[in-house]
């Protein structure tokens, strides 16, 4: 057994970073034990090694460090997480330490939080439907097991409520397999942390969840570790315990801000908007940990949530996230101001794998056809409403007025389901058919006649007028 060497050669401390001189045999990502002059112990991780100098990032901050009296010991291994199936139903801090007052966990093993690279050949194709209970996602932007589908939010929008709703309601249909939610909250306030903990406890969703909470006043370095710790937990539950795991990570913008803070402390050359040039690579090490493996029963599905600075979808964080992931769910300021909850803007939203998780045997045979028809009708109705604003309602044809009526009801009944309504996919499909019945059958050109005969409700012959709601 090798003896760990202790160093007292700390030469500099800058923000969350510490420089240790005259080191030997130190490796990148190695875990570091730090003992202060008063006996307090802290943890760190090697960020960079140049010659006999090691740059260490501190997990608990640098306050109170005395350069001459601080002892540093390199452990010889990277940061590891003690994992156990008993983690389900528990609440942890951003570094994986229990904070719920529950019993001490007995680790089944220790896993590197950076995970293992997945051979692309070993990946299985995502093709099983996950029901979130939200019509705008399940019906129009279907989430598939093993997919990574981000939510693009904006300042002041209720993405926390949406995240909690998905955590409560998500399930895999037609399966007896265990389902779990791993929830990673990064850089949130005390109020937001209380909301998530209370919501999951009161609804009973905590019984199938693992919650990691990194607060806004916690060190930035911890914020960088939190999603990796959450994903390590998810991979353990999925690939070693055979569970289907949904990982919800919010807010990825706070994570990227922590990366920028550490990069600035390292005096690295900044990239776009001051973020490090390796932001894309760094995000991919998180997002690419979603998926299914051939021969493994479990799966890891991701819903990362981010706040777009100034609602700018071209900002580096949503821009790079969109390149790596398989679609996006976009929340709308306009829908939110009009009182619609959740304010999901379905037209620019997209799930690139939605066709793989829908259809007979997975949802229902009319899923794809009604999805396409709803998209087309809603887009045409929005155009008709814009035309009415410019030219007046008198300029609209009778068909245009029907499209406007459809659009109003679509937003009020379909999108605006609230944060505590859990709709099955059958209920979403049936509601879609009910709304499509507002339009003449001749306008439903994206649905085959035999499907119209089977599912389309009979028109209400007593309706002689269509009233167009004024915005």
Swiss-Prot record:
Q: Which GO terms describe its molecular function?
A: ATP binding; proton-transporting ATP synthase activity, rotational mechanism
Q: Which Pfam families does the entry link to? A: ATP-synt_ab (PF00006), ATP-synt_ab_N (PF02874), ATP-synt_VA_C (PF22919)
The record's InterPro entries line, in alphabetical order, gives: ATP-synt_VA_C (IPR055190), ATPase_a/bsu_AS (IPR020003), ATPase_F1/V1/A1_a/bsu_N (IPR004100), ATPase_F1/V1/A1_a/bsu_nucl-bd (IPR000194), P-loop_NTPase (IPR027417), V-ATPase_su_B/beta (IPR022879)
Q: Does the keyword Ion transport apply?
A: yes
Q: Which domain of life is it from?
A: Bacteria
Q: Which GO terms describe its biological process?
A: proton motive force-driven plasma membrane ATP synthesis
UniProt entry keywords in alphabetical sequence = ATP synthesis, Hydrogen ion transport, Ion transport, Transport
State the PROSITE patterns in the record. Answer: ATPASE_ALPHA_BETA
Q: Which NCBIfam families match?
A: PRK04196.1 (NF003235)
- What is the similarity comment for this entry? Belongs to the ATPase alpha/beta chains family.
Described by its record, this protein's role is as follows: Produces ATP from ADP in the presence of a proton gradient across the membrane. The V-type beta chain is a regulatory subunit.
From the Swiss-Prot or TrEMBL record, give the protein name. V-type ATP synthase beta chain
Species this chain originates from: Streptococcus pyogenes serotype M49 (strain NZ131)
């Amino acid at each position: 057994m090798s003896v760990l060497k202790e160093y007292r050669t700390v030469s500099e401390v800058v923000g969350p970073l510490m420089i240790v001189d005259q080191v030997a045999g130190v490796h990148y990502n190695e875990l570091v034990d730090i003992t202060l002059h008063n006996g307090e112990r802290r943890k760190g991780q090697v960020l960079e090694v140049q010659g006999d100098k090691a740059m260490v990032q501190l997990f608990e901050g640098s306050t109170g460090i005395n350069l001459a009296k601080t002892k540093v010991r390199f452990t010889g291994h990277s940061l590891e997480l003690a994992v156990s199936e008993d983690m389900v139903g528990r609440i942890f801090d951003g570094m994986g330490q229990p904070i719920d007052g529950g019993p001490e966990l007995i680790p089944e093993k220790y896993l590197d939080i950076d995970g293992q690279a997945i051979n692309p050949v070993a990946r299985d194709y995502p093709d099983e439907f996950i029901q979130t209970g939200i019509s705008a996602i399940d019906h129009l932007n279907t989430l598939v097991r093993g997919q990574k589908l981000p939510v693009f939010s904006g300042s002041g929008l209720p993405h926390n409520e949406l995240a909690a709703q998905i955590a409560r309601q998500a399930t895999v249909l037609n399966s007896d397999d265990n389902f779990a939610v791993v929830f990673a909250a990064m850089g949130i306030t005390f109020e937001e942390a209380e909301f998530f903990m209370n919501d999951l406890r009161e609804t009973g969703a905590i019984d199938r969840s693992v919650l990691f909470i990194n607060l806004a006043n916690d060190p930035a370095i911890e914020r960088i570790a939190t999603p990796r710790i959450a994903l390590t937990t998810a991979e353990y539950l999925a690939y070693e315990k055979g569970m289907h795991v949904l990982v919800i990570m919010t807010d990825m913008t706070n994570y990227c801000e922590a990366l920028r803070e550490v990069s600035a402390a390292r005096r690295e050359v900044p990239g776009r908007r001051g973020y490090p040039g390796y932001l894309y690579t760094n995000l991919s090490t998180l997002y690419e940990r979603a998926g299914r493996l051939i021969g493994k029963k479990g799966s890891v599905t991701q819903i990362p949530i981010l706040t777009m600075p100034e609602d700018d979808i071209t900002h580096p964080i949503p821009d790079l996230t969109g390149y790596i992931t398989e679609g996006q769910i976009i929340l709308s300021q306009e829908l939110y101001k009009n009182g619609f909850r959740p304010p999901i803007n379905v037209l620019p939203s997209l799930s690139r794998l939605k066709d793989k998780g829908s259809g007979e045997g997975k949802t229902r045979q009319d899923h794809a056809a009604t999805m396409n028809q709803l998209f087309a009708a809603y887009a045409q109705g929005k155009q008709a409403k814009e035309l009415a604003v410019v030219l007046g309602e008198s300029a609209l044809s009778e068909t245009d007025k029907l499209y406007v009526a459809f659009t109003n009801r679509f937003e009020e009944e379909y999108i605006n389901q609230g944060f505590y309504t859990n709709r099955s996919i059958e209920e979403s499909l049936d509601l879609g058919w009910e709304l499509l019945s507002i339009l003449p059958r001749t306008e439903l050109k994206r649905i085959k006649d035999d499907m119209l005969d089977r599912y389309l409700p009979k028109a209400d012959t007593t309706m002689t007028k269509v009233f167009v709601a004024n915005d």
